[in-house]
Amino acid sequence: MNVHVEVVCITADGTEQRREVLGIERAELAMETLGLSLQEGKALLKGVQDWVVAQQVNENLERQRVCKHCGRRHSTKDAGSTPVKTVFGRVEVPNPRWHRCTCETTGARTFRPTKAWLQGRTSPELLHLETSGLRRSLSPKWRTC
């Protein structure tokens, strides 16, 4: 038996983009082959997380690519990425640097379009879980000794 897990992203304009995130093959049914292994489950989650992050960021970048003042596209200075820690592990977030449009005469010559929302390198949900876990571990009722 072959199983293929695919993620489908439907953009605002109705375009579908597909990506296979996991493919597994099972020959015989046995306790060892029942369901997903831990490794397969982690690979599935990582594949979905990476794809969703890439689609979200790329759609956001595409909306910002055109200069608000004159309509020309911002050219790329460099195409970097930033590692971000999430509840499900580390992901690489596209974080390009673009040249400011020639119609803009003030400010730096380059900018990062993700600056408005890419604050820090840890997701708020992970920070919340880490701090609530720390509070619990320091609380007298959670101490074991």
Model-assigned labels for residue ranges:
Residues 1-102:
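Short, conserved DNA-binding cores of transcription-related domains
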